[in-house]
């Protein structure tokens, strides 16, 4: 599903050495990439989400593919049905044009021009997975940080992506909510044949739910297990 072979990325105007990645994973399930603040986790997450070159300018060399398509070949808007990225700041990922959580979750599927029956099925299933059913009629602006993170993850799940990137997407959740969501997401990925890639600073509890993991250090990836 994701392949990076001696893949080098040098951001525009960067004075640092280029990032150099070797990564290959094709099975459904959940894997993790760990790294300290400033290690380049978000940059790699955005590369894997297909943000280059639209929102991630710079130069790339060597081989990189996402779901079989070379990085940079498919416009970001065309990738939204198959690749989703959830980042650390949930408030920045709300559409800003809906008046309820239910409308927010429906926003993505509606933009795919899906049938109404399919949209309704998705806005039932995604909030159920993330424990957002009691929030369905709340205005997004009234949600707490943890509630907003669960809603944003539900929005991504409602798109039914083959590749879901979660960049510190659990930072505002309680430990209990984090464990619950990891367990459900792991099951969802295996059931649907999708791949979830977690980007986190700390290994606990995430490593317990992952089939494989890497450490991002010195602008490169090192296998952990």
Question: Could you say what each language-model-derived stretch is?
Answer:
Residues 63-78:
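ABC ATPase NBD Q-loop/coupling interface
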Residues 89, 97-111:
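Q-loop/switch helix immediately C-terminal to the Walker
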Residues 153:
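Hydrophobic anchor residue at the start of the ABC signature
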Residues 164-168:
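Catalytic Walker B motif of ABC-type/P-loop ATPase nucleotide-binding domains
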